[in-house]
Amino acid sequence: MKLMCMMIVAVLFLTAWTFVTADDSINGPENRRIWEKLLSKTRDEMKNPEASKLNKKECRQPGEFCFPVVAKCCGGTCLVICI
């Protein structure tokens, strides 16, 4: 019984190892390069938050249309038009 359990565990381990180390032939090397490029870009943005475009919030200039809750005015006051 112990030998049978050890054999089952060994087969499961080797099967898992095969799946983990297998080459992903469907996505090919060109797709891997794309993912590596995207991941390196996100790592750079994490190290330097100013590099992220999402952190840049624009403010509206005086005289431009704004919505009081959503838009931010550079001058600070939004009453449908930035003051």
Curated annotation (Swiss-Prot):
Expressed by the venom duct. The keyword Secreted applies. GO terms for molecular function: ion channel inhibitor activity; toxin activity. Pfam families: Conotoxin (PF02950). It comes from the Eukaryota. Residues 23-55 form a propeptide. It is found in: Secreted. Disulfide bonds join 59-74, 66-78, 73-82. Its main location: secreted. The keyword Secreted applies. Keywords: Cleavage on pair of basic residues, Disulfide bond, Knottin, Neurotoxin, Secreted, Signal, Toxin. GO terms for cellular component: extracellular region. Belongs to the conotoxin O1 superfamily. The presence of a 'disulfide through disulfide knot' structurally defines this protein as a knottin. This is Conotoxin VnMKLT1-022. It comes from Conus ventricosus (Mediterranean cone).
